[in-house]
Amino acid sequence: MKLCSLQQLVLAVLFIVSNFYLPLAVASPIGWDFAVTLRDKLLFLDNKFKTVSSAAHEFEGISALAFDEAEEVIYFNDQQHQNGSIFSLRRDAAVASHIVEQAVQRIGNGSVSGLAFDPLNRNLFWADMRQSRIYFASVDTLHTEPPKVLVDLSAEGGRPDGVAVDICRRQLYWTNSKINHASVERIGLNGTGRQVIIKENIDMPRGIVIDQQSDRIYWLDDKVGIFFAIESARLDGSDRQLVLEDKHQSPIQLAITDETIYWTDKADKAVWSYPKPANKKLATNATEPVVEPIKLASWKEDVYGIVARTGFYQHLQKDAHCASVVKKVKQRLDNRLNNRTQSRTAVDDRIEELEREHCLNGATYMTKGNFCICQVGFKGARCEISECHNYCVHGTCEISSMGYPKCYCQTDFYGERCEYYKCNNHCLNGGHCTVDRDSGEMSCDCRDNFTGTRCEHNETAHCGSYCQHLKEHPDAFVPAPCMDICEELRLTNATIVREYQSSAFCSDMPSYRQGSLIIVLVVGVVSSLALVAVIVHGFRLIHKPKRPRIKKTFVVRKQARLNSTSDTPLTNRPLATEQCEITIENCCNMNICETPCFDPKLVEQQFSGRDKKSPCVKEDKKILIHNMEDDLLN
Protein backbone atom coordinates (compact mmCIF):
# COMPACT_ATOMS: atom_id res chain seq x y z
CA MET A 1 0.00 0.00 0.00
CA LYS A 2 2.82 2.37 0.86
CA LEU A 3 4.66 1.38 -2.32
CA CYS A 4 1.63 2.23 -4.39
CA SER A 5 1.24 5.64 -2.80
CA LEU A 6 4.93 6.35 -3.36
CA GLN A 7 4.65 5.47 -7.04
CA GLN A 8 1.61 7.68 -7.39
CA LEU A 9 3.48 10.57 -5.79
CA VAL A 10 6.42 10.16 -8.18
CA LEU A 11 4.13 10.02 -11.19
CA ALA A 12 2.26 13.10 -10.01
CA VAL A 13 5.49 15.03 -9.58
CA LEU A 14 6.73 14.00 -13.03
CA PHE A 15 3.42 14.96 -14.59
CA ILE A 16 3.39 18.39 -12.94
CA VAL A 17 7.05 19.01 -13.76
CA SER A 18 6.51 18.17 -17.41
CA ASN A 19 3.43 20.37 -17.58
CA PHE A 20 5.24 23.14 -15.76
CA TYR A 21 8.37 23.30 -17.90
CA LEU A 22 6.72 22.77 -21.25
CA PRO A 23 4.64 25.96 -21.16
CA LEU A 24 7.59 27.93 -19.85
CA ALA A 25 9.91 26.71 -22.56
CA VAL A 26 7.51 26.73 -25.46
CA ALA A 27 4.63 29.09 -24.74
CA SER A 28 5.92 31.61 -22.29
CA PRO A 29 4.10 34.92 -22.49
CA ILE A 30 7.45 36.67 -22.32
CA GLY A 31 8.14 35.25 -25.77
CA TRP A 32 6.74 38.38 -27.40
CA ASP A 33 7.89 41.98 -27.10
CA PHE A 34 5.29 43.83 -29.19
CA ALA A 35 1.64 43.40 -30.05
CA VAL A 36 -0.18 45.08 -32.93
CA THR A 37 -3.79 45.03 -34.08
CA LEU A 38 -4.88 44.31 -37.60
CA ARG A 39 -8.53 44.64 -38.45
CA ASP A 40 -9.35 40.98 -37.79
CA LYS A 41 -6.62 39.72 -35.43
CA LEU A 42 -3.89 40.43 -32.90
CA LEU A 43 -0.26 39.75 -33.77
CA PHE A 44 2.45 39.07 -31.17
CA LEU A 45 5.96 39.97 -32.37
CA ASP A 46 9.49 39.52 -31.06
CA ASN A 47 12.10 42.27 -30.82
CA LYS A 48 12.94 41.79 -34.51
CA PHE A 49 9.27 42.16 -35.44
CA LYS A 50 8.91 38.56 -36.49
CA THR A 51 5.47 37.08 -35.80
CA VAL A 52 5.46 34.81 -32.75
CA SER A 53 1.73 34.05 -32.61
CA SER A 54 -1.68 35.50 -33.37
CA ALA A 55 -5.07 35.58 -31.64
CA ALA A 56 -8.61 37.02 -31.70
CA HIS A 57 -9.37 35.83 -35.22
CA GLU A 58 -13.11 35.90 -34.58
CA PHE A 59 -13.26 39.72 -34.53
CA GLU A 60 -13.63 42.05 -37.52
CA GLY A 61 -13.07 45.62 -36.30
CA ILE A 62 -10.09 45.67 -33.93
CA SER A 63 -8.26 49.00 -33.56
CA ALA A 64 -7.18 50.23 -30.10
CA LEU A 65 -4.94 48.28 -27.73
CA ALA A 66 -3.82 48.38 -24.07
CA PHE A 67 -1.57 46.08 -22.02
CA ASP A 68 -1.68 45.16 -18.33
CA GLU A 69 1.92 44.12 -17.80
CA ALA A 70 1.29 43.10 -14.20
CA GLU A 71 -1.33 40.49 -15.07
CA GLU A 72 -0.21 39.75 -18.66
CA VAL A 73 -3.61 40.76 -20.08
CA ILE A 74 -4.28 42.46 -23.41
CA TYR A 75 -7.31 44.75 -23.78
CA PHE A 76 -8.64 45.58 -27.23
CA ASN A 77 -11.80 46.93 -28.81
CA ASP A 78 -14.02 45.78 -31.68
CA GLN A 79 -15.96 48.40 -33.63
CA GLN A 80 -18.21 45.80 -35.31
CA HIS A 81 -19.24 43.64 -32.35
CA GLN A 82 -22.94 43.80 -31.51
CA ASN A 83 -22.79 43.39 -27.72
CA GLY A 84 -19.36 44.29 -26.41
CA SER A 85 -16.97 47.09 -27.29
CA ILE A 86 -13.86 46.16 -25.25
CA PHE A 87 -12.50 42.65 -24.66
CA SER A 88 -9.68 41.09 -22.63
CA LEU A 89 -7.24 38.44 -23.85
CA ARG A 90 -5.23 36.27 -21.48
CA ARG A 91 -2.76 33.62 -22.49
CA ASP A 92 -3.21 30.31 -20.69
CA ALA A 93 0.27 28.85 -20.48
CA ALA A 94 -0.99 25.46 -19.34
CA VAL A 95 -2.79 24.78 -22.60
CA ALA A 96 -0.84 27.22 -24.80
CA SER A 97 -3.97 29.04 -25.94
CA HIS A 98 -5.70 32.40 -25.55
CA ILE A 99 -8.81 33.10 -23.52
CA VAL A 100 -10.95 36.02 -24.71
CA GLU A 101 -13.63 37.55 -22.51
CA GLN A 102 -15.95 40.52 -22.85
CA ALA A 103 -14.77 43.35 -20.61
CA VAL A 104 -17.04 46.31 -21.46
CA GLN A 105 -20.52 46.19 -22.92
CA ARG A 106 -21.27 48.44 -25.86
CA ILE A 107 -22.67 51.86 -24.90
CA GLY A 108 -24.99 53.15 -27.62
CA ASN A 109 -23.18 53.93 -30.86
CA GLY A 110 -19.83 54.54 -29.19
CA SER A 111 -16.55 54.34 -31.08
CA VAL A 112 -13.41 53.55 -29.07
CA SER A 113 -10.34 55.35 -30.45
CA GLY A 114 -7.81 54.96 -27.63
CA LEU A 115 -7.24 52.63 -24.65
CA ALA A 116 -5.08 52.90 -21.53
CA PHE A 117 -4.72 50.84 -18.34
CA ASP A 118 -3.79 51.74 -14.76
CA PRO A 119 -2.11 48.72 -13.07
CA LEU A 120 -2.46 50.18 -9.56
CA ASN A 121 -6.23 50.61 -9.34
CA ARG A 122 -6.84 48.23 -12.26
CA ASN A 123 -8.91 50.82 -14.10
CA LEU A 124 -9.42 50.82 -17.84
CA PHE A 125 -9.69 54.19 -19.64
CA TRP A 126 -10.91 54.71 -23.19
CA ALA A 127 -11.72 57.64 -25.49
CA ASP A 128 -15.04 57.60 -27.34
CA MET A 129 -14.61 59.93 -30.31
CA ARG A 130 -18.19 59.62 -31.49
CA GLN A 131 -19.70 60.59 -28.13
CA SER A 132 -16.87 63.05 -27.30
CA ARG A 133 -16.26 61.47 -23.90
CA ILE A 134 -13.56 59.67 -21.95
CA TYR A 135 -14.83 56.72 -19.88
CA PHE A 136 -13.24 54.60 -17.18
CA ALA A 137 -14.18 51.43 -15.33
CA SER A 138 -12.57 48.95 -12.97
CA VAL A 139 -11.86 45.59 -14.58
CA ASP A 140 -12.73 43.93 -11.26
CA THR A 141 -16.27 45.40 -11.14
CA LEU A 142 -17.19 45.62 -14.81
CA HIS A 143 -19.96 43.08 -14.38
CA THR A 144 -21.56 44.92 -11.45
CA GLU A 145 -20.92 48.62 -12.15
CA PRO A 146 -21.39 50.48 -15.45
CA PRO A 147 -18.59 52.63 -16.90
CA LYS A 148 -18.30 56.20 -15.65
CA VAL A 149 -17.56 59.42 -17.51
CA LEU A 150 -14.24 60.99 -16.58
CA VAL A 151 -14.23 63.86 -19.13
CA ASP A 152 -17.17 65.10 -21.21
CA LEU A 153 -16.14 67.09 -24.30
CA SER A 154 -19.49 67.01 -26.08
CA ALA A 155 -20.44 70.58 -25.11
CA GLU A 156 -17.27 71.99 -26.67
CA GLY A 157 -17.29 69.65 -29.67
CA GLY A 158 -14.05 67.89 -28.72
CA ARG A 159 -12.74 64.74 -30.40
CA PRO A 160 -10.70 62.68 -27.90
CA ASP A 161 -8.37 60.33 -29.71
CA GLY A 162 -5.33 58.88 -27.95
CA VAL A 163 -5.14 58.34 -24.16
CA ALA A 164 -2.24 57.49 -21.85
CA VAL A 165 -1.95 56.98 -18.08
CA ASP A 166 0.89 58.37 -16.00
CA ILE A 167 0.83 55.61 -13.40
CA CYS A 168 3.40 57.34 -11.18
CA ARG A 169 1.87 60.82 -10.92
CA ARG A 170 -1.74 59.61 -11.29
CA GLN A 171 -2.60 61.66 -14.38
CA LEU A 172 -4.49 60.87 -17.58
CA TYR A 173 -3.29 62.48 -20.83
CA TRP A 174 -5.28 62.62 -24.05
CA THR A 175 -5.17 64.20 -27.50
CA ASN A 176 -8.04 66.31 -28.82
CA SER A 177 -8.10 66.16 -32.63
CA LYS A 178 -10.83 68.77 -33.14
CA ILE A 179 -10.10 70.69 -36.34
CA ASN A 180 -8.78 74.23 -35.71
CA HIS A 181 -8.97 73.63 -31.94
CA ALA A 182 -6.63 70.66 -31.47
CA SER A 183 -4.82 70.23 -28.16
CA VAL A 184 -3.08 67.92 -25.72
CA GLU A 185 -4.66 67.89 -22.27
CA ARG A 186 -4.42 66.12 -18.93
CA ILE A 187 -6.55 65.52 -15.85
CA GLY A 188 -6.14 63.73 -12.53
CA LEU A 189 -7.29 60.13 -12.40
CA ASN A 190 -9.82 61.28 -9.81
CA GLY A 191 -11.40 63.65 -12.36
CA THR A 192 -9.97 66.94 -11.06
CA GLY A 193 -7.41 69.45 -12.30
CA ARG A 194 -8.10 69.45 -16.03
CA GLN A 195 -5.42 71.40 -17.90
CA VAL A 196 -4.59 72.18 -21.53
CA ILE A 197 -0.83 71.79 -21.89
CA ILE A 198 -0.36 72.01 -25.69
CA LYS A 199 -2.56 74.12 -27.98
CA GLU A 200 -0.25 76.05 -30.33
CA ASN A 201 1.04 74.82 -33.70
CA ILE A 202 -0.81 71.52 -33.58
CA ASP A 203 -3.12 70.19 -36.30
CA MET A 204 -4.49 66.70 -35.64
CA PRO A 205 -2.82 64.88 -32.72
CA ARG A 206 -3.39 61.12 -32.64
CA GLY A 207 -1.62 58.61 -30.39
CA ILE A 208 0.09 59.62 -27.15
CA VAL A 209 2.38 57.78 -24.73
CA ILE A 210 4.17 58.49 -21.42
CA ASP A 211 7.91 57.86 -21.08
CA GLN A 212 8.55 57.34 -17.38
CA GLN A 213 12.29 57.14 -17.94
CA SER A 214 12.63 60.74 -19.15
CA ASP A 215 9.39 62.12 -17.59
CA ARG A 216 8.13 63.25 -20.98
CA ILE A 217 5.14 62.75 -23.25
CA TYR A 218 5.34 61.83 -26.93
CA TRP A 219 2.51 62.28 -29.41
CA LEU A 220 1.80 61.95 -33.13
CA ASP A 221 0.54 64.94 -35.12
CA ASP A 222 -0.99 64.31 -38.54
CA LYS A 223 -0.20 67.67 -40.14
CA VAL A 224 -2.23 69.40 -42.82
CA GLY A 225 -1.14 68.13 -46.22
CA ILE A 226 1.39 65.35 -46.66
CA PHE A 227 3.44 65.89 -43.50
CA PHE A 228 3.32 64.37 -40.02
CA ALA A 229 5.39 64.91 -36.90
CA ILE A 230 6.42 63.21 -33.67
CA GLU A 231 6.78 65.73 -30.88
CA SER A 232 7.78 65.60 -27.24
CA ALA A 233 7.37 67.76 -24.14
CA ARG A 234 7.70 67.57 -20.41
CA LEU A 235 4.73 66.31 -18.46
CA ASP A 236 3.53 69.88 -17.89
CA GLY A 237 3.81 70.80 -21.59
CA SER A 238 7.05 72.78 -21.30
CA ASP A 239 10.27 72.18 -23.24
CA ARG A 240 8.43 71.20 -26.41
CA GLN A 241 10.68 69.49 -28.97
CA LEU A 242 10.26 68.23 -32.52
CA VAL A 243 11.55 64.66 -32.65
CA LEU A 244 10.77 63.83 -36.28
CA GLU A 245 9.02 65.43 -39.24
CA ASP A 246 8.35 63.31 -42.30
CA LYS A 247 5.74 62.93 -45.03
CA HIS A 248 3.51 60.48 -46.87
CA GLN A 249 2.34 58.60 -43.79
CA SER A 250 -0.90 58.31 -41.84
CA PRO A 251 0.20 57.63 -38.23
CA ILE A 252 -2.32 56.18 -35.76
CA GLN A 253 -0.80 54.97 -32.46
CA LEU A 254 2.68 54.83 -30.97
CA ALA A 255 4.65 52.98 -28.30
CA ILE A 256 8.00 53.64 -26.67
CA THR A 257 10.81 51.59 -25.13
CA ASP A 258 14.13 52.47 -23.52
CA GLU A 259 15.75 53.54 -26.78
CA THR A 260 13.19 53.58 -29.59
CA ILE A 261 9.86 55.08 -30.66
CA TYR A 262 7.46 52.86 -32.63
CA TRP A 263 4.30 53.89 -34.48
CA THR A 264 1.73 52.36 -36.81
CA ASP A 265 1.15 53.76 -40.29
CA LYS A 266 -2.22 53.21 -41.94
CA ALA A 267 -1.04 54.51 -45.32
CA ASP A 268 1.77 51.96 -45.75
CA LYS A 269 0.12 49.36 -43.47
CA ALA A 270 3.38 49.15 -41.58
CA VAL A 271 5.19 49.74 -38.29
CA TRP A 272 8.05 52.25 -38.23
CA SER A 273 10.76 53.01 -35.68
CA TYR A 274 12.96 55.97 -34.83
CA PRO A 275 15.61 56.41 -32.09
CA LYS A 276 14.36 58.12 -28.97
CA PRO A 277 16.23 61.36 -28.28
CA ALA A 278 18.76 61.04 -25.50
CA ASN A 279 18.38 63.16 -22.40
CA LYS A 280 21.93 64.41 -22.58
CA LYS A 281 24.22 64.33 -25.58
CA LEU A 282 27.97 64.43 -25.29
CA ALA A 283 29.35 67.57 -26.93
CA THR A 284 31.85 66.64 -29.64
CA ASN A 285 33.17 68.13 -32.83
CA ALA A 286 32.22 65.07 -34.84
CA THR A 287 29.01 65.11 -36.82
CA GLU A 288 26.56 62.34 -36.02
CA PRO A 289 25.02 60.55 -39.00
CA VAL A 290 21.51 61.52 -40.04
CA VAL A 291 19.02 58.89 -38.90
CA GLU A 292 16.01 58.03 -41.03
CA PRO A 293 12.86 56.19 -39.91
CA ILE A 294 13.01 52.43 -40.42
CA LYS A 295 10.11 50.34 -41.67
CA LEU A 296 10.16 47.25 -39.46
CA ALA A 297 7.22 45.27 -40.84
CA SER A 298 4.26 45.64 -43.19
CA TRP A 299 1.09 43.68 -43.89
CA LYS A 300 -1.68 43.48 -46.44
CA GLU A 301 -4.23 44.71 -43.91
CA ASP A 302 -4.52 48.03 -42.11
CA VAL A 303 -2.56 48.20 -38.86
CA TYR A 304 -3.85 50.32 -35.96
CA GLY A 305 -2.84 49.80 -32.32
CA ILE A 306 0.55 48.89 -30.89
CA VAL A 307 1.88 48.14 -27.39
CA ALA A 308 5.37 47.27 -26.15
CA ARG A 309 6.80 45.75 -23.01
CA THR A 310 8.32 48.47 -20.86
CA GLY A 311 9.47 46.37 -17.91
CA PHE A 312 8.35 49.06 -15.49
CA TYR A 313 8.65 46.63 -12.56
CA GLN A 314 12.41 46.48 -13.01
CA HIS A 315 13.14 49.99 -14.24
CA LEU A 316 10.94 52.01 -11.90
CA GLN A 317 11.65 50.34 -8.57
CA LYS A 318 13.99 53.16 -7.53
CA ASP A 319 12.27 56.04 -9.30
CA ALA A 320 11.27 58.78 -6.86
CA HIS A 321 7.76 59.09 -8.28
CA CYS A 322 7.14 55.47 -9.22
CA ALA A 323 8.72 53.42 -6.43
CA SER A 324 5.63 53.52 -4.22
CA VAL A 325 3.31 52.53 -7.09
CA VAL A 326 5.51 49.61 -8.12
CA LYS A 327 5.73 48.48 -4.50
CA LYS A 328 1.94 48.50 -4.12
CA VAL A 329 1.43 46.55 -7.35
CA LYS A 330 3.95 43.90 -6.30
CA GLN A 331 2.38 43.71 -2.86
CA ARG A 332 -1.03 43.08 -4.37
CA LEU A 333 0.37 40.29 -6.51
CA ASP A 334 2.17 38.75 -3.52
CA ASN A 335 -1.01 38.84 -1.44
CA ARG A 336 -2.88 37.05 -4.17
CA LEU A 337 -0.18 34.40 -4.23
CA ASN A 338 -0.26 33.98 -0.44
CA ASN A 339 -4.02 33.56 -0.42
CA ARG A 340 -3.70 30.17 -1.99
CA THR A 341 -4.69 27.17 0.07
CA GLN A 342 -2.55 26.54 3.13
CA SER A 343 -2.70 22.78 2.80
CA ARG A 344 0.64 21.91 1.31
CA THR A 345 1.80 18.58 -0.03
CA ALA A 346 5.05 17.28 -1.38
CA VAL A 347 3.84 18.18 -4.85
CA ASP A 348 3.25 21.79 -3.79
CA ASP A 349 6.71 21.99 -2.28
CA ARG A 350 8.26 20.62 -5.45
CA ILE A 351 6.34 23.12 -7.60
CA GLU A 352 7.49 25.98 -5.40
CA GLU A 353 11.07 24.78 -5.71
CA LEU A 354 10.76 24.65 -9.48
CA GLU A 355 9.33 28.15 -9.48
CA ARG A 356 12.29 29.45 -7.53
CA GLU A 357 14.71 27.74 -9.88
CA HIS A 358 12.95 29.03 -12.97
CA CYS A 359 13.44 32.75 -12.26
CA LEU A 360 17.15 33.59 -12.01
CA ASN A 361 19.18 36.34 -10.37
CA GLY A 362 16.82 36.82 -7.44
CA ALA A 363 13.70 37.33 -9.57
CA THR A 364 10.16 36.69 -8.31
CA TYR A 365 7.92 34.20 -10.10
CA MET A 366 4.27 35.18 -10.58
CA THR A 367 2.14 32.06 -10.72
CA LYS A 368 -1.02 33.62 -12.13
CA GLY A 369 0.68 35.40 -14.95
CA ASN A 370 3.39 32.77 -15.38
CA PHE A 371 6.23 35.28 -15.64
CA CYS A 372 9.19 36.60 -13.67
CA ILE A 373 9.64 40.01 -12.09
CA CYS A 374 13.36 40.66 -12.47
CA GLN A 375 15.68 42.50 -10.14
CA VAL A 376 17.20 45.79 -11.25
CA GLY A 377 19.77 45.20 -13.96
CA PHE A 378 18.35 41.99 -15.46
CA LYS A 379 15.87 41.11 -18.17
CA GLY A 380 14.60 38.16 -20.17
CA ALA A 381 11.93 35.51 -19.73
CA ARG A 382 13.82 34.08 -16.74
CA CYS A 383 15.80 37.24 -15.88
CA GLU A 384 18.86 35.51 -17.24
CA ILE A 385 20.23 38.45 -19.26
CA SER A 386 22.11 41.35 -17.74
CA GLU A 387 21.08 44.80 -18.93
CA CYS A 388 24.77 45.53 -19.54
CA HIS A 389 25.31 42.50 -21.75
CA ASN A 390 26.84 43.77 -25.04
CA TYR A 391 25.39 47.21 -24.36
CA CYS A 392 28.51 49.41 -24.41
CA VAL A 393 30.54 49.03 -27.60
CA HIS A 394 33.71 50.80 -26.46
CA GLY A 395 33.29 51.49 -22.78
CA THR A 396 32.33 50.25 -19.35
CA CYS A 397 28.70 49.58 -18.45
CA GLU A 398 27.05 50.21 -15.10
CA ILE A 399 23.43 50.05 -13.97
CA SER A 400 22.17 53.48 -12.98
CA SER A 401 20.04 54.21 -9.94
CA MET A 402 17.00 54.12 -12.23
CA GLY A 403 17.83 50.60 -13.36
CA TYR A 404 19.07 51.50 -16.84
CA PRO A 405 22.48 50.67 -18.32
CA LYS A 406 24.89 53.59 -18.55
CA CYS A 407 28.14 53.67 -20.51
CA TYR A 408 31.43 55.29 -19.54
CA CYS A 409 33.21 55.63 -22.88
CA GLN A 410 36.87 55.36 -23.69
CA THR A 411 38.64 58.59 -24.60
CA ASP A 412 38.42 57.99 -28.34
CA PHE A 413 34.67 57.25 -28.41
CA TYR A 414 31.35 58.91 -27.58
CA GLY A 415 27.62 58.26 -27.85
CA GLU A 416 24.95 56.64 -25.70
CA ARG A 417 26.61 53.27 -26.22
CA CYS A 418 30.11 54.56 -27.06
CA GLU A 419 29.48 53.58 -30.66
CA TYR A 420 30.94 56.66 -32.38
CA TYR A 421 34.68 57.11 -32.99
CA LYS A 422 35.71 60.72 -32.45
CA CYS A 423 38.32 60.71 -35.22
CA ASN A 424 35.96 59.28 -37.81
CA ASN A 425 36.25 61.56 -40.91
CA HIS A 426 37.80 64.31 -38.82
CA CYS A 427 41.17 64.67 -40.59
CA LEU A 428 41.04 65.29 -44.34
CA ASN A 429 43.44 64.54 -47.20
CA GLY A 430 44.90 61.48 -45.54
CA GLY A 431 45.80 63.16 -42.27
CA HIS A 432 46.29 61.07 -39.13
CA CYS A 433 44.00 61.83 -36.19
CA THR A 434 44.99 61.48 -32.55
CA VAL A 435 43.02 62.12 -29.37
CA ASP A 436 44.64 63.62 -26.30
CA ARG A 437 44.23 61.22 -23.40
CA ASP A 438 43.86 63.97 -20.84
CA SER A 439 41.71 66.62 -22.54
CA GLY A 440 40.02 64.47 -25.17
CA GLU A 441 40.82 67.06 -27.86
CA MET A 442 41.46 65.87 -31.41
CA SER A 443 44.46 66.90 -33.49
CA CYS A 444 45.59 66.08 -37.03
CA ASP A 445 49.07 65.14 -38.29
CA CYS A 446 48.93 66.30 -41.91
CA ARG A 447 50.76 64.99 -44.94
CA ASP A 448 53.33 67.07 -46.79
CA ASN A 449 52.01 70.26 -48.38
CA PHE A 450 48.73 70.12 -46.36
CA THR A 451 47.91 72.42 -43.47
CA GLY A 452 44.98 73.41 -41.27
CA THR A 453 43.39 72.06 -38.12
CA ARG A 454 41.83 69.30 -40.23
CA CYS A 455 44.43 69.27 -43.06
CA GLU A 456 41.93 71.01 -45.26
CA HIS A 457 44.38 73.36 -47.04
CA ASN A 458 46.44 72.11 -50.00
CA GLU A 459 49.61 74.18 -49.96
CA THR A 460 50.67 73.09 -53.46
CA ALA A 461 47.46 74.32 -55.05
CA HIS A 462 47.43 77.23 -52.63
CA CYS A 463 50.82 78.50 -53.76
CA GLY A 464 50.40 77.61 -57.43
CA SER A 465 48.95 80.97 -58.41
CA TYR A 466 51.80 82.80 -56.70
CA CYS A 467 54.30 80.64 -58.49
CA GLN A 468 52.62 81.29 -61.82
CA HIS A 469 52.55 85.02 -61.10
CA LEU A 470 56.19 84.93 -59.97
CA LYS A 471 57.16 83.30 -63.25
CA GLU A 472 55.72 86.22 -65.20
CA HIS A 473 56.70 88.94 -62.72
CA PRO A 474 59.93 88.08 -60.88
CA ASP A 475 59.51 91.00 -58.45
CA ALA A 476 56.00 89.99 -57.37
CA PHE A 477 55.12 89.30 -53.74
CA VAL A 478 55.16 85.62 -52.69
CA PRO A 479 54.45 84.40 -49.13
CA ALA A 480 57.43 82.83 -47.43
CA PRO A 481 55.87 79.32 -47.07
CA CYS A 482 55.36 79.23 -50.86
CA MET A 483 58.97 79.91 -51.81
CA ASP A 484 60.05 76.27 -51.44
CA ILE A 485 57.03 75.03 -53.35
CA CYS A 486 57.64 77.49 -56.18
CA GLU A 487 61.25 76.38 -56.35
CA GLU A 488 60.18 72.74 -56.47
CA LEU A 489 57.64 73.47 -59.21
CA ARG A 490 60.25 75.38 -61.16
CA LEU A 491 62.68 72.49 -61.04
CA THR A 492 60.05 69.92 -62.00
CA ASN A 493 58.49 72.27 -64.58
CA ALA A 494 55.06 71.36 -63.17
CA THR A 495 51.85 73.29 -63.65
CA ILE A 496 49.01 73.85 -61.23
CA VAL A 497 45.41 73.22 -62.07
CA ARG A 498 44.01 76.53 -63.30
CA GLU A 499 40.92 76.45 -61.07
CA TYR A 500 43.07 76.97 -58.00
CA GLN A 501 45.02 79.95 -59.35
CA SER A 502 42.50 82.76 -59.08
CA SER A 503 41.04 81.84 -55.72
CA ALA A 504 44.36 81.18 -54.03
CA PHE A 505 45.96 84.32 -55.40
CA CYS A 506 43.12 86.55 -54.26
CA SER A 507 42.65 84.97 -50.89
CA ASP A 508 46.26 85.35 -49.80
CA MET A 509 47.00 88.79 -51.28
CA PRO A 510 48.74 91.08 -48.74
CA SER A 511 46.33 92.97 -46.55
CA TYR A 512 47.39 96.42 -47.76
CA ARG A 513 46.79 95.37 -51.38
CA GLN A 514 43.42 93.98 -50.50
CA GLY A 515 42.48 97.26 -48.79
CA SER A 516 43.57 99.36 -51.79
CA LEU A 517 41.64 97.11 -54.16
CA ILE A 518 38.49 97.46 -52.06
CA ILE A 519 38.81 101.28 -51.98
CA VAL A 520 39.27 101.46 -55.76
CA LEU A 521 36.25 99.25 -56.32
CA VAL A 522 34.07 101.32 -54.00
CA VAL A 523 35.13 104.64 -55.56
CA GLY A 524 34.54 103.27 -59.05
CA VAL A 525 31.07 102.05 -58.19
CA VAL A 526 30.10 105.36 -56.58
CA SER A 527 31.46 107.36 -59.54
CA SER A 528 29.57 105.20 -62.00
CA LEU A 529 26.33 105.70 -60.12
CA ALA A 530 26.85 109.48 -59.98
CA LEU A 531 27.55 109.63 -63.73
CA VAL A 532 24.42 107.66 -64.48
CA ALA A 533 22.38 110.02 -62.27
CA VAL A 534 23.73 113.11 -64.11
CA ILE A 535 22.96 111.64 -67.53
CA VAL A 536 19.43 110.71 -66.52
CA HIS A 537 18.80 114.18 -65.10
CA GLY A 538 20.10 115.82 -68.31
CA PHE A 539 17.77 113.78 -70.47
CA ARG A 540 14.86 114.77 -68.26
CA LEU A 541 15.65 118.48 -68.64
CA ILE A 542 16.00 118.23 -72.42
CA HIS A 543 12.83 116.29 -73.05
CA LYS A 544 10.72 117.97 -70.38
CA PRO A 545 7.88 120.04 -72.02
CA LYS A 546 7.92 123.83 -71.46
CA ARG A 547 5.37 125.36 -69.14
CA PRO A 548 2.69 127.28 -71.08
CA ARG A 549 2.77 131.12 -70.86
CA ILE A 550 -0.44 132.65 -69.62
CA LYS A 551 -1.52 135.66 -71.68
CA LYS A 552 -4.35 138.06 -70.80
CA THR A 553 -5.37 141.12 -72.77
CA PHE A 554 -6.92 144.25 -71.23
CA VAL A 555 -8.77 146.94 -73.15
CA VAL A 556 -8.11 150.43 -71.77
CA ARG A 557 -8.70 153.94 -72.96
CA LYS A 558 -5.95 156.27 -73.78
CA GLN A 559 -7.32 159.26 -71.83
CA ALA A 560 -9.75 159.47 -69.00
CA ARG A 561 -12.99 161.39 -69.47
CA LEU A 562 -14.00 164.41 -67.47
CA ASN A 563 -16.44 162.51 -65.31
CA SER A 564 -14.04 159.67 -64.77
CA THR A 565 -14.62 159.70 -61.02
CA SER A 566 -17.78 157.71 -61.43
CA ASP A 567 -16.63 155.58 -64.30
CA THR A 568 -16.08 151.91 -63.92
CA PRO A 569 -14.89 149.38 -66.49
CA LEU A 570 -18.44 148.08 -66.79
CA THR A 571 -20.37 151.42 -67.02
CA ASN A 572 -18.03 153.39 -69.19
CA ARG A 573 -16.48 151.33 -71.93
CA PRO A 574 -13.91 153.14 -74.13
CA LEU A 575 -14.76 154.15 -77.66
CA ALA A 576 -13.13 152.53 -80.62
CA THR A 577 -11.00 155.59 -81.21
CA GLU A 578 -9.94 155.79 -77.57
CA GLN A 579 -9.15 152.17 -76.71
CA CYS A 580 -5.97 150.25 -76.90
CA GLU A 581 -4.96 146.68 -76.06
CA ILE A 582 -1.97 145.53 -74.12
CA THR A 583 -0.85 142.13 -72.82
CA ILE A 584 -0.70 141.78 -69.06
CA GLU A 585 2.90 140.48 -69.16
CA ASN A 586 4.04 143.62 -70.97
CA CYS A 587 2.14 145.78 -68.55
CA CYS A 588 3.75 144.12 -65.58
CA ASN A 589 7.18 144.75 -67.03
CA MET A 590 6.61 148.56 -67.22
CA ASN A 591 6.42 151.24 -64.54
CA ILE A 592 4.51 154.49 -64.35
CA CYS A 593 7.29 156.53 -65.95
CA GLU A 594 7.05 154.46 -69.09
CA THR A 595 3.89 154.14 -71.13
CA PRO A 596 1.22 153.67 -68.47
CA CYS A 597 -1.32 150.99 -69.15
CA PHE A 598 -3.88 152.16 -66.66
CA ASP A 599 -4.09 155.53 -64.94
CA PRO A 600 -6.92 155.55 -62.49
CA LYS A 601 -7.75 158.59 -60.37
CA LEU A 602 -6.25 157.10 -57.24
CA VAL A 603 -2.85 156.73 -58.86
CA GLU A 604 -2.92 160.31 -60.08
CA GLN A 605 -3.67 161.55 -56.57
CA GLN A 606 -0.85 159.49 -55.04
CA PHE A 607 1.65 160.85 -57.52
CA SER A 608 0.36 164.47 -57.65
CA GLY A 609 2.61 165.68 -54.88
CA ARG A 610 5.70 164.01 -56.26
CA ASP A 611 8.16 166.01 -58.29
CA LYS A 612 7.59 165.28 -61.94
CA LYS A 613 11.29 165.27 -62.55
CA SER A 614 12.01 162.74 -59.82
CA PRO A 615 13.23 159.36 -61.02
CA CYS A 616 10.78 156.42 -61.07
CA VAL A 617 11.06 153.72 -58.45
CA LYS A 618 10.04 150.09 -58.32
CA GLU A 619 7.10 150.82 -56.05
CA ASP A 620 5.39 152.59 -58.95
CA LYS A 621 4.76 149.29 -60.68
CA LYS A 622 3.41 147.68 -57.51
CA ILE A 623 0.90 150.51 -56.99
CA LEU A 624 -0.10 150.36 -60.63
CA ILE A 625 -0.79 146.66 -60.58
CA HIS A 626 -2.59 146.80 -57.23
CA ASN A 627 -4.99 149.54 -58.33
CA MET A 628 -5.51 147.99 -61.70
CA GLU A 629 -6.68 144.73 -60.14
CA ASP A 630 -8.98 146.56 -57.69
CA ASP A 631 -10.60 148.67 -60.38
CA LEU A 632 -11.12 145.74 -62.66
CA LEU A 633 -12.83 143.79 -59.89
CA ASN A 634 -15.05 146.75 -59.04
UniProtKB/Swiss-Prot annotation:
It comes from Drosophila mojavensis (Fruit fly). Keywords: Cell membrane, Differentiation, Disulfide bond, EGF-like domain, Glycoprotein, Membrane, Oogenesis, Repeat, Signal, Spermatogenesis, Transmembrane, Transmembrane helix. It holds the Pfam family Ldl_recept_b. This is Protein cueball. One of its GO terms (cellular component) is plasma membrane. The chain crosses the membrane at residues 516-536. Belongs to the cueball family. The gene is cue. One of its GO terms (molecular function) is Wnt receptor activity.
